[in-house]
Design a protein with these regions (language model features):
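Catalytic active-site module of serine/aspartate enzymes centered on a nucleophile-bearing elbow/loop
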Residues: 217-263
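Hydrophobic, aromatic-rich cap/lid helix
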Residues: 150-178, 194
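Conserved alpha/beta-hydrolase "acid-adjacent" motif
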Residues: 196-202
Length: 263
């Protein structure tokens, strides 16, 4: 287990591979652990990092640091501590909001973003996320009781419930995406069609996307496409990371596999 001391507190992370940096940021449920397969795939060409945000996994429970602004500050401190320059960000749920907010503030440091099951407008997050009483109950609901998903979320109960509630109830999703969208950083939005927590944006909600933003819907996935359909997700991740810097993710539709899934 690798740790770094930031703001006088322990932050846990894992790293694989060599090359240009990619940072994986987890959702409201779970930790770095469910990224293992994606990290292994990315690490063949990139240096893949995954960290636990404040209040999750083996990172310190620091109740004053649970807002999205504080999670963004954690990411910035981590990148500086690791000596990482321009980076690709792969964020999921909460992690996607952190990645987008980071981009809105430090766009010159972000090469591209993959935002997975991210609420891009207010009201896209299911009301159940705002009424959580136990993490175990939330895991059961969001995983659909799928054994492989539940196994990958084995350390989800390490999280501080307040860390989830603070960001769920922050109500900044629409604002965060709008600000990031103005930066014209290449951004691929990936949605699982069957995600119970975050609704899939419709054509009206994505009509104001930057020309460097693009959406792909994975029809057989829920909230965890990197687990529900790992092979397909990892191919998409590989193709996305392989795009030349500055290219729109819409270039992915040149490949037959993604053409019919484009929104």
């Amino acid at each position: 287990m690798s740790v770094v001391l930031l703001d006088e507190a322990i932050v846990h992370y894992e790293v694989l591979g060599k090359g240009r940096p990619v940072i994986f940021l987890h959702s409201w449920i779970g930790s770095w652990q469910y990224w293992i397969s994606a990290m292994q795939v990315a690490s063949t060409s990139f240096r893949a990092y995954a960290l636990d945000l404040w209040g999750f996994g083996d990172t310190t429970h620091k109740t004053t640091h649970y807002t999205i602004d504080q999670q963004v500050a954690l990411l910035r401190s981590f990148l500086k501590e690791m000596g990482i320059g321009k980076v690709a960000l792969v964020g999921h749920g909460l992690g996607a909001l952190v990645a987008l907010d980071y981009t809105s503030k430090y766009s010159d440091e972000v090469d591209r973003i993959m935002a997975i099951n991210c609420p891009v407008k207010s009201g896209m997050l299911h009301e159940k996320m705002r009424k959580i009483s136990t993490i175990a109950g939330l895991v059961e609901w969001i995983s659909g009781s799928a054994p492989n998903v539940q196994a990958a979320l084995g350390d989800a109960t390490k999280a501080d419930l307040s860390a989830i509630a603070t960001t769920v109830n922050g109500g900044r999703a629409g604002e965060i995406f709008t600000k990031a969208n103005r930066q014209h950083t290449p951004c691929l939005l990936v949605n699982g069609r069957n995600d119970p927590a975050v609704s899939v944006p419709d054509i009206h909600q994505i009509s104001d996307f930057s020309h460097l933003s693009h959406q792909i819907v994975l029809e057989k996935s829920g909230h965890f496409p990197m687990i529900d359909d790992a092979a397909k997700f990892n191919r998409l991740l590989t193709d996305f990371l392989a795009l030349d810097s500055g290219l729109s993710p819409s270039e992915l539709q040149l490949k037959d596999e993604w053409r019919r899934r484009v929104r």
